[in-house]
Amino acid sequence: LVIGVQFLLWTTSGLIFSWNSIESVRGENLIRSQEPLNLRSQEIDDLGELLDSPALAMREDDIVVSALLRTMLDRPVFELTIVRNKKQLVVLVDAVSGKQLSPIDEVMAKRIAQSDFADDAEVRSVEFVESVGSHSEYRGKELPAYRVEMEHTTDTVIYVSANRGAVTTRRNNQWR
């Protein structure tokens, strides 16, 4: 009888999990599609100007480990991983102006979350997260970050890295 009950519970839970697609659990079905970066549409006169822009935000003794050109809110940005004072950190730089953008502020985090979210939902709340507990829904992820809660039936929460200005993860009712 005990084995039968265990088997019934195991089978039932398996069926429940198989009905929910992993994309819905991860919130991937609520990601807005993004246009690819078109450098011709930006205010860049030549490629040399683009490649010079990260140097404007760097210090003389910085060592570049990696440079990634990507978009943030339809603008080209460089995500630089650098070593500064023997510490590795990420610096976000506007690829056109060379202005350092990181760490981003709450307003920018809100805009990034809204541009990532497929539905036109308002933001319910924004919280700056510097540390999390071992049972947090955001454990093991990049900190500091902004926790942006969307006003939506799925109770979606979008986490945005303060240093990278990028969505790191999404949580919703199905995940919880």
Predicted regions located by residue number:
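Extended, hydrophilic extramembrane loops/domains of integral membrane proteins
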Residues: 95-122, 143-176
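Internal alpha-helical transmembrane segments
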Residues: 1-32
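Short, non-transmembrane alpha-helical segments in secretory-pathway proteins
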Residues: 26-72, 103-137
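Exposed beta-strand-loop-beta-strand "reactive/processing" segments of non-cytosolic proteins
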Residues: 57-91, 129-158
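Primarily extracytoplasmic ectodomains and periplasmic/lumenal surface modules that are beta-strand-rich
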Residues: 9, 86-88, 100
